[in-house]
Curated annotation (Swiss-Prot):
GO terms, molecular function: ATP binding; ATP hydrolysis activity
Region (Docks into pockets in the proteasome alpha-ring): 593-594
Chain coiled-coil ranges: 35-86
Name of protein: Proteasome-associated ATPase
Bias (Polar residues) ranges: 1-10
Gene this protein is translated from: arc
Length: 594
């Protein structure tokens, strides 16, 4: 049989490569479609499972929170139950700290060697242990501690904030003090840890625990601190006008012994203990006292080479020093001089200034409603005599009624130097004016033009005309007519009642008038008319107050110190010059003072 010839050589290349059958292609496409649907179904299931998982996670978080809340509530209830059944803690005050010690022949027991504290608890003194959780170094005597039911110190607290008030009288070593309590009862107390590092001085008020005998804290006493104003004055002698001779007298009495103590000792001289400044009010007594303190500080710095050396000016407010309780005023005086000695102990000059000295230390036996001066005056005398051992303390008293001060205070050896601060005359008033009218002030153009623009010449002319107006004895300046017991009469002018304070008021008024003119007329500068107007207004302000001036001072001005004034008549003719003069009724028995 003849074989069939092979037809492969007659096929196309595609047929030779094995092209898919159409039926097979449809089958494959169908399978792919089914696979896609299954993938989409699986994706949907996966998303659903993810949502279920997220919801389960959220529910789980809520469940955890609820469980935590339930746990906390259970713990709170458990703690509440524990606290309800827990015994109370007690308080104690530390009396002594006992660190751990080595046993000795007589003290080998645990109570004597182990770390412990002595406390005061429920009226008993006890030695108790300290919890290991409490740092022994953070405990101090006088401090409160917390004790458990076994009386073991489990916590350190603060210091008691309430207690009995006492006054420190004397320090006894470093940890004890002598204090004065109610009814002048003296007591020895111990200082708590809070006061060990604090500087205490005699007169300080302390709060104490009367049960334990510990001083707990230092209490500020505002009513005492207000009586003494400690300051470093910035007033110099150059700031004071019209008192040249008085200042020179004070400098000789105060600064010479301070600058040349060797010469004074060589000649057997002692520095004065005190100065009395007396005279009418408003004439510079307080300013001089401050200038003395400032000058002493400057001289002390020059002598010692210590530029940081300060001076202290203890300004005693006289009327406020008085106290209705017996012994309180004397205690305040002792406190003042104790503070002065403390400040002067390091070489700083101290001036103790008693203003209105007559209100405190008047002549014994002259009191009408009380005899408080019978104890205050001796207290001051003893303190002044005690200043003898201190070279840096000087007492300065100021008064406009020096005749009322007890003679024992004014005798030599106490207030040695007595300086009368008189009312300023015309020359002194001009000197005071120069302190307030200076060349740096704005002056009106018309006043400057009268002196070719020379500011100093303008100031000189203003002051000269103002002083002439103040010290004129014309009829317009008549103020009072004084009649004495012997029938003599004397006319007193406004110049007889002038003072440094009046001069300052005149200048202040003139400056105020200049400001008002600037606001209304737009013309700037001080004018002589402002000063003259201020003089008139200042004098007229005193029209209704002639009886406020000391009649004894009027007698001194007229040279009849011992004569009694029986009648006073005002001559002022009213602010507008139209009102009639006024008179004070004749007093049949006025005594030495009106």
């Amino acid at each position: 049989m003849m074989e069939t010839p092979n037809n492969d050589s007659s096929r196309t290349p595609d047929e030779a490569a094995g092209a898919p059958d159409p039926e097979s292609a449809r089958y494959v496409a169908n399978e792919l479609s089914v696979a896609d649907r299954q993938v989409n179904i699986l994706r949907d299931k996966l998303r659903h499972i993810d949502r279920q998982l997220a919801a389960a996670t959220q529910n789980n978080s809520k469940l955890v929170g609820m469980l935590e809340t339930a746990k906390a509530e259970i713990l709170r209830l458990k703690n509440a139950l524990d606290q309800e059944g827990q015994p109370p803690y007690s308080f104690g005050t530390i009396l002594q700290l006992n660190p751990k010690r080595q046993p000795t022949a007589g003290n080998s027991g645990q109570a004597a060697t182990e770390e412990s504290v002595d406390i005061f608890n429920a009226g008993r003194k006890m030695r108790v242990g300290v919890s290991p959780l409490v740092n022994m170094n953070q405990l101090a005597v006088g401090q409160e501690v917390l004790l458990n039911e076994a009386l073991l110190v489990v916590a350190g607290l603060g210091y008691e904030r309430a207690g009995e008030l006492v006054t420190l009288k004397e320090m006894l070593g470093t940890d004890r003090a002598l204090v004065v309590g109610r009814a002048d009862e003296e007591r020895v107390i111990r200082l708590s840890g809070a006061l060990m590092s604090e500087k205490l001085r005699v007169g300080d008020a302390l709060s104490i625990d009367s049960r334990t005998g510990y001083a707990l804290e230092k209490v500020p006493r505002s009513e005492v601190e207000n009586l003494v104003l400690e300051e470093v004055p910035d007033i110099t002698y150059e700031d004071i006008g019209g008192l040249g001779p008085q200042i020179e007298q004070i400098r000789d009495a105060v600064e010479l012994p301070f600058l040349h103590p060797d010469l004074y000792r060589e000649h057997g001289l002692k520095a004065p203990k005190g100065i009395l400044l007396y005279g009418p009010p408003g004439c510079g007594k307080t300013l001089i006292a401050k200038a003395v303190a400032n000058s002493l500080a400057a001289r002390a710095a020059e002598r010692t080479g210590n530029v940081d050396l300060k001076s202290y000016f203890l300004n005693i407010k006289g009327p406020e020093l008085l106290d209705k309780y017996v012994g309180e005023t004397e205690r305040h005086i002792r406190l003042i001089f104790s503070r002065a000695r403390e400040k002067a102990s390091d070489g700083s000059p101290v001036v103790v200034f008693f203003d209105e000295m007559d209100s405190l230390f008047r002549t014994r036996g002259t009191g009408i409603s009380s005899d408080v001066e019978t104890t205050i005056v001796p207290q001051l005398l003893s303190e002044i005599d005690g200043v003898e051992r201190l070279d840096n303390v000087i007492v300065i008293g100021a008064s406009n009624r020096e005749d009322m001060i007890d003679p024992a205070i004014l005798r030599p050896g106490r207030l040695d130097v007595k300086v009368k601060i008189q009312r300023p005359d015309a020359e002194a008033a001009a000197d005071i004016f120069y302190k307030y009218i200076t060349t740096d002030l704005p002056f009106h153009e018309s006043d400057l033009a009268e002196h070719s623009g020379d500011v100093q010449a303008t100031v000189d002319a203003m002051i000269q005309r103002t002083v002439e107006a103040m010290y004129s004895t014309e009829k317009s300046n008549e103020y009072l007519e004084v009649t004495y017991a012997n029938g003599d009469t004397e006319m007193l002018y406004f110049k007889d009642f002038n003072s440094g304070a009046v001069v300052q008021n005149v200048v202040d008024r003139a400056k105020k008038y200049a400001i008002k003119d600037l606001l209304t007329t737009q013309q700037k500068g001080l004018r002589i008319d402002h000063l003259l107007r201020a003089v008139v207004d200042e004098f007229r302000e005193h029209e209704d107050m002639p009886n406020t001036t000391n009649p004894d001072d009027w007698a001194r001005i007229s040279g009849k110190k011992g004569e009694r004034i029986t009648y006073i008549r005002t001559i002022v003719q009213g602010k507008a010059g139209q009102e009639p003069g006024k008179s004070i009724e004749t007093m049949p028995s006025t005594g030495q003072y009106l």
